[in-house]
């Protein structure tokens, strides 16, 4: 029933196999790729183009369902919903690798679906998914005449490169590099780097490319065995129209010389509309005219740049647009920056939060928490267009993740800066390199916020104009240069090294020479941008803004964690409610306190310490009146514990009633005199100097007792002495806290203990 064809090799210490003929046989191309114990099913389906389509409707989807990891989806709905960010990013990597390899003018609809069948949580699925996509295209009959492969590269602590590192190896790696290419050239690069030099990054690319060759050979042998050759595709012939367009060359050249984007766009649209109306009258097809005009413009601009060494806006090939930098422009945010480069502008805003604000990510490796989030928004008005607001698309997710990768290596360790950080980049204008403007703006906004980043980060987008062996590398490309050029190579980093890379091609690949020179030229541009940024702000603020949440942390004994939390969270909830703060307790005993002010944070800290500390006779505590009876006052500690005080201990003088001195909700300092059998503290107000908060050393008023034999005698049935040798009575023994009230550190004015509800 099945005609199975399978090819395999040993690659990177693991078996890599391609198999077809058993699964998904109705697709035009179907391949199961196994790498280690990770398996991906890739299918390709082709649909003949619609008449109105004048672009390549390529749709790439990577799908990772939870069964592949042996899990059931969490939450109320037990079925997968919209694609995760990880799925979207893998889909983009595959799309960017294969899209440039389809012939120009081929507009059939192509669907590439990569289903993760099983995942061993060791071998990431990106590599087998791309390999499977290329293999499935190669056997589908689609006019796809190039054979490429993908590879991941890591770098260990000894600067040794790792081929296809495991998930665990990648966690300790200073490099996370994914690249694709054929035997002779590089096609796509995506990377996060921990400030490695351009030389190290270039060598990593060469290392990865060298290990692509066995896989490319495997795919070719696999396709040859099946024998379904790609069909030929004749390019569109619009030579007769192109000849008629020559007379519009000067008009296009003048329009493209406009440095203001809006003026340039208006001038170009006027010329195109004139050409379309003129040639339609001669009977020419509208789609053919549009196709010919596009190619004519592309050839014209590329020739001007290559031969005259002058770019669209008059800059030299390595010149950066004018840069304007502002910080702290939004008064009530935790940090903000406005970064403008030419006609590209990013408003970047930061917000600080607690661990409770972290993003819980349901990833294929399992749930994890992200304390740094970067969200990129690209509204339609940024390019002068109208469009309804919608959820972030693939492009916005991809650009945001690239900026995240650029900034992530310079963020402080969470133990140093425990805030959760959210960054939002609003692109207000765009004429190329908006993702790199986001990188620059994020670095500025974080420093304005007071985040102790290791170094400022800047980003730049490099372009390429290539004609056979001649080429020109462009720094800080415009949107039109991206559209008409051959490469979009984004490089971000500090003055010391690279932190992120992303390279996309519109041709079938570039040489190592171009890659190396692009990295060198990008470094010069990056240093120039950093100089402009550092002139405004070069170091992080000493502290977070006044209206930002205040944070402090301290440690408690691990055996006190349960007491600090309390039964069903009663203690920590009580402290949070009373102090107006947020408190988080880690498994290691670390307590993080977040409050709107430093004073509130200190109060919460003191209350938490008090709630787990032994309360002893002689302690001076803060209390509040909660109920007044005839001769007894019921008091409450700041952490919620209750105590009692007799009328004779209210004032150092005779009083007829408690209400003459105290009323409901009054607060004061009291001395712990003794404990009832049940552990309830007996308190005294008159034995504390209310101005200094210290033990009252003066003479105490002593009148003849007028209470009955079962009143005061039963309540204060023991004498109290501050002197050594005095009769100090404690409540029933409890587990020791590690502190004594006399010797423990002074955490605040609240030296009480609680934890008993």
UniProtKB/Swiss-Prot annotation:
<dbReference type="InterPro" id="IPR036345">
    <property type="entry name" value="ExoRNase_PH_dom2_sf"/>
</dbReference>
<dbReference type="Pfam" id="PF00013">
    <property type="entry name" value="KH_1"/>
</dbReference>
<dbReference type="Pfam" id="PF00575">
    <property type="entry name" value="S1"/>
</dbReference>
<dbReference type="InterPro" id="IPR001247">
    <property type="entry name" value="ExoRNase_PH_dom1"/>
</dbReference>
<feature type="compositionally biased region" description="Basic residues">
    <location>
        <begin position="725"/>
        <end position="734"/>
    </location>
</feature>
<keyword id="KW-0460">Magnesium</keyword>
<dbReference type="InterPro" id="IPR015847">
    <property type="entry name" value="ExoRNase_PH_dom2"/>
</dbReference>
<dbReference type="InterPro" id="IPR012162">
    <property type="entry name" value="PNPase"/>
</dbReference>
<feature type="binding site">
    <location>
        <position position="488"/>
    </location>
    <ligand>
        <name>Mg(2+)</name>
    </ligand>
</feature>
<dbReference type="GO" id="GO:0005829">
    <property type="term" value="C:cytosol"/>
</dbReference>
<dbReference type="GO" id="GO:0006402">
    <property type="term" value="P:mRNA catabolic process"/>
</dbReference>
<dbReference type="InterPro" id="IPR027408">
    <property type="entry name" value="PNPase/RNase_PH_dom_sf"/>
</dbReference>
<dbReference type="InterPro" id="IPR004087">
    <property type="entry name" value="KH_dom"/>
</dbReference>
<dbReference type="GO" id="GO:0000175">
    <property type="term" value="F:3'-5'-RNA exonuclease activity"/>
</dbReference>
<dbReference type="InterPro" id="IPR015848">
    <property type="entry name" value="PNPase_PH_RNA-bd_bac/org-type"/>
</dbReference>
<dbReference type="Pfam" id="PF01138">
    <property type="entry name" value="RNase_PH"/>
</dbReference>
<feature type="binding site">
    <location>
        <position position="482"/>
    </location>
    <ligand>
        <name>Mg(2+)</name>
    </ligand>
</feature>
<feature type="region of interest" description="Disordered">
    <location>
        <begin position="698"/>
        <end position="757"/>
    </location>
</feature>
<dbReference type="InterPro" id="IPR036612">
    <property type="entry name" value="KH_dom_type_1_sf"/>
</dbReference>
<keyword id="KW-0694">RNA-binding</keyword>
<keyword id="KW-0808">Transferase</keyword>
<dbReference type="InterPro" id="IPR004088">
    <property type="entry name" value="KH_dom_type_1"/>
</dbReference>
<feature type="compositionally biased region" description="Basic and acidic residues">
    <location>
        <begin position="702"/>
        <end position="714"/>
    </location>
</feature>
<dbReference type="InterPro" id="IPR003029">
    <property type="entry name" value="S1_domain"/>
</dbReference>
<keyword id="KW-0479">Metal-binding</keyword>
<dbReference type="GO" id="GO:0004654">
    <property type="term" value="F:polyribonucleotide nucleotidyltransferase activity"/>
</dbReference>
<dbReference type="GO" id="GO:0000287">
    <property type="term" value="F:magnesium ion binding"/>
</dbReference>
<keyword id="KW-0963">Cytoplasm</keyword>
<comment type="function">
    <text>Involved in mRNA degradation. Catalyzes the phosphorolysis of single-stranded polyribonucleotides processively in the 3'- to 5'-direction.</text>
</comment>
<protein>
    <recommendedName>
        <fullName>Polyribonucleotide nucleotidyltransferase</fullName>
        <ecNumber>2.7.7.8</ecNumber>
    </recommendedName>
</protein>
<keyword id="KW-0548">Nucleotidyltransferase</keyword>
<feature type="domain" description="KH">
    <location>
        <begin position="549"/>
        <end position="608"/>
    </location>
</feature>
<dbReference type="InterPro" id="IPR020568">
    <property type="entry name" value="Ribosomal_Su5_D2-typ_SF"/>
</dbReference>
<dbReference type="InterPro" id="IPR012340">
    <property type="entry name" value="NA-bd_OB-fold"/>
</dbReference>
<dbReference type="GO" id="GO:0006396">
    <property type="term" value="P:RNA processing"/>
</dbReference>
<feature type="domain" description="S1 motif">
    <location>
        <begin position="618"/>
        <end position="686"/>
    </location>
</feature>
<comment type="similarity">
    <text>Belongs to the polyribonucleotide nucleotidyltransferase family.</text>
</comment>
<dbReference type="Pfam" id="PF03726">
    <property type="entry name" value="PNPase"/>
</dbReference>
<dbReference type="Pfam" id="PF03725">
    <property type="entry name" value="RNase_PH_C"/>
</dbReference>
<dbReference type="GO" id="GO:0003723">
    <property type="term" value="F:RNA binding"/>
</dbReference>
